[in-house]
Amino acid sequence: MPGELGSRTGQMTDLIYAEKDLVQSLKEYIRAEENKLSQIKSWAEKMDVLTSKSTSDPEGYLAHPVNAYKLVKRLNTDWLELENLVLQDTTNGFIANLTIQRQFFPTEEDETGAAKALMRLQDTYKLDAETLSRGNLPGTKYRSTLTVGDCFGMGRTAYNDGDYYHTVLWMEQALKQHDEGEDAAVSKVEILDYLSYAVFQFGDLHRAMELTRRLISLDSTHERAGSNLRYFEKLLEKEREEEGKEKSVNNTGTTTEAVVQSGAYERPLDYLPERDIYEALCRGEGVKMTPRRQKRLFCRYHDGNKNPHLLIAPFKEEDEWDSPHIVRYYDVMSDEEIEKIKELAKPRLARATVRDPKTGVLTVASYRVSKSSWLEEDDDPVVAKVNQRMQQITGLTVKTAELLQVANYGMGGQYEPHFDFSRKDEPDAFKRLGTGNRVATFLNYMSDVEAGGATVFPDFGAAIWPKKGTAVFWYNLYRSGEGDYRTRHAACPVLVGCKWDLDKVSEATHRLEEEVAEPGTHPTFWRR
């Protein structure tokens, strides 16, 4: 689906090698055409250095979100410009290879999606444009920077989406780097054109005029800028007429110049009421882990209520939260099992969907950005083995559970606050599964994440960080069958790295007392 490439690390890795192949093809073309333009040769050398670094450790390279964005941008925009240049002096070999590879290239929508992912990281983790542009991110192996053109591309993406907040941030960064002397194909005039209009959209008329005047000083023939400036001047004159005077009068009768706050623009509110709480938890802020609560959390060995399979080798169990009770189990999956699960899942990965509460139809949504696939026990013995292990740990039957769901969160991958259970206003949400509502969630972490990617619960202020080989477990319903609305949770955007998890949601078609009525299967911590 367009716009989702950045959410899948495996597919992005393929692009690394595709780009490397193109570089080799380009070098062969240069050798065949010794009189080739020096501009193309320079491009090839630059790409050769870049792809040599990226192919030496593709996953590590793509762990840096700036690298991932620039890869998509290069393949969608920069290589197209090069193709046009080469076509001026056509050589069949290189063009044929490029044409073949282009069918696998990112699209305009993919580049837009990658840019929006960077903006999502920028907002969630309170990173200014300067930090992202300079590549100063925690846990990164490769330092990668954004050029003036890259920053301009980010700003233009935001502008085309009607997002003037990010337009201002990124056009300002592009202008700053341009003013510092960085070489750029994009001109200051182009940057100022976008920036002045975006600033005007925030109602900052004085700064819009200032930026427009600067644009005109660089290009006095710019018709739109001249027209805009005249329009701004008329608006300002109208404002002054309505006020009756240029200066505001205070209560003492003295006059003061009206204060204009330039450049301080607030991020617009959106559809998510708990946005601030959710994003703060993603940053590790506002976690309500008090000393009193900490004293109620313990570690123990868990044998599944004396399950014969676990008596000899019980699992290490750690309380993550007291109410609702959330626990973490250690060494649930081995590295070999994790790699096998990922191997089975990768060919089937597709954009994760959500159920539209109004229509009941599965659809993609901007608040869930990841790739997922579903595994059955018949797919491989390891699936049945992992399934059985989760049943032994939780005491919940696998027969009334969804298939194993593997999720891959790449650059900016996230799942905003949501419930795992069906609410009363959507009683048929799980009808297609032939089971019932989702009793509990067993979430296996199949990777460590260098930065970001926490599982957070905005209602009670908990944040749980991924640890490879561990799993967290909680109940979504009370024993009465009523949903526990406190369990609304989210998968925070991945800032640096790649996140893999394996999700198992147990379901019930009847009252939960019957679901766990079999002796020895009732989890000890389930509370009404």
For the regions a language model picked out, list residue spans one by one.
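Fe(II)/2-oxoglutarate oxygenase catalytic core
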Residues: 1-473, 477-528
